[in-house]
Each structure stands twice: as C-alpha cells, then as structure tokens.
Amino acid sequence: MSLSDPIADMLTRIRNAQQAKHELCVIPGSKIKKSILDLLKEEGFVDDVQTVKNGSFDDFQVKLKYDTEKKPVIRMIERVSTPGRRVYIQSGEIRPFRNNIGTLILSTSKGVMTGKRARKLRVGGEVLCKVF
C-alpha cells in the first residue's frame, strides 16, 4: 500500500490508539519516524519506543503514556507541513508553543529536533508537527 504522507499516518495511528485507550501502538518503520518517536519519548509524550523485526522490515512498538486518571498525555498531535503544502520557519520565527508546554518538531539541516533546540542552535527548517 502506498502512502502519500507516512508521517501523518504515524501521527494518526498514535492519536487513534490513545483515543481507544490502547497500551501499545505499532508503526511501520523509517528513519524520520524513528527520529520523531525518539523526540516524543525524550519530551515525555510516550513511555517507550522499541524496534521490532517484521520480516525484512522494522516496525516501531510505541508504549503510550497516560496520566493517573487514564487520560492521554498527548492532548493534541497535528501534522503541520504536508506534501501538498510545505511549511518552513526561520530560527527567529520559532516561538514557544502553548506556553512552553507544547512542542514543535522540525526537520532542519542538522537533523530532526524540537523547536526549543532549533531556536538555541539558531537553525530553521520544515515544521513537521506540533504536539501538546
């Protein structure tokens, strides 16, 4: 099956799994997805990310995170730049998102990173998604 936007598919799988109160979510693997998932883990939005062999391909098994009342930690996860409408931002235009509670994830010339880190390194790039 051909996907026109695999990152949006990954974000939708996470969103749907959390709404259904699933503990785990399986996502087909790629390097950019791994980078995004590692950032989500680093920022505390997911508990764990493991690589699972699926034949000759790798899948990612994401352990979703919930608060004490069984509400998802990720309140909103949204794709910003799409294949049909790319959104780029300069380092000076990167602002705190949702009073520094939310996170922008950017693809820069120095790799995939959060908006905070990109602002610190003074690099801009493509806004992949925002998470709150």
Curated annotation (Swiss-Prot):
Tell me the InterPro entries matching this sequence: Ribosomal_uS8, Ribosomal_uS8_CS, Ribosomal_uS8_sf
Q: Output the PROSITE patterns linked to this UniProt entry.
A: RIBOSOMAL_S8 (PS00053)
Which Gene Ontology terms describe the biological processes this protein takes part in?
translation
What Pfam family does this protein match (any one)?
Ribosomal_S8
Question: How is this protein annotated for GO cellular component?
Answer: ribonucleoprotein complex; ribosome
Task: Write out the GO MF terms.
Answer: rRNA binding; structural constituent of ribosome
For this UniProt record, give its keywords in alphabetical order, as a comma-separated list: Ribonucleoprotein, Ribosomal protein, RNA-binding, rRNA-binding
Domain of life from the UniProt record: Bacteria
What do we know about how this protein assembles, alone or with others? Answer: Part of the 30S ribosomal subunit. Contacts proteins S5 and S12.
Q: Which family does it belong to?
A: Belongs to the universal ribosomal protein uS8 family.
The record's PANTHER family line, in alphabetical order, gives: 40S RIBOSOMAL PROTEIN S15A (PTHR11758)
Q: What does this protein do?
A: One of the primary rRNA binding proteins, it binds directly to 16S rRNA central domain where it helps coordinate assembly of the platform of the 30S subunit.
Q: What is this protein called?
A: Small ribosomal subunit protein uS8
> Taxonomic lineage per UniProt?
Bacteria, Pseudomonadati, Spirochaetota, Spirochaetia, Leptospirales
As recorded in Swiss-Prot or TrEMBL, the protein's gene is named rpsH
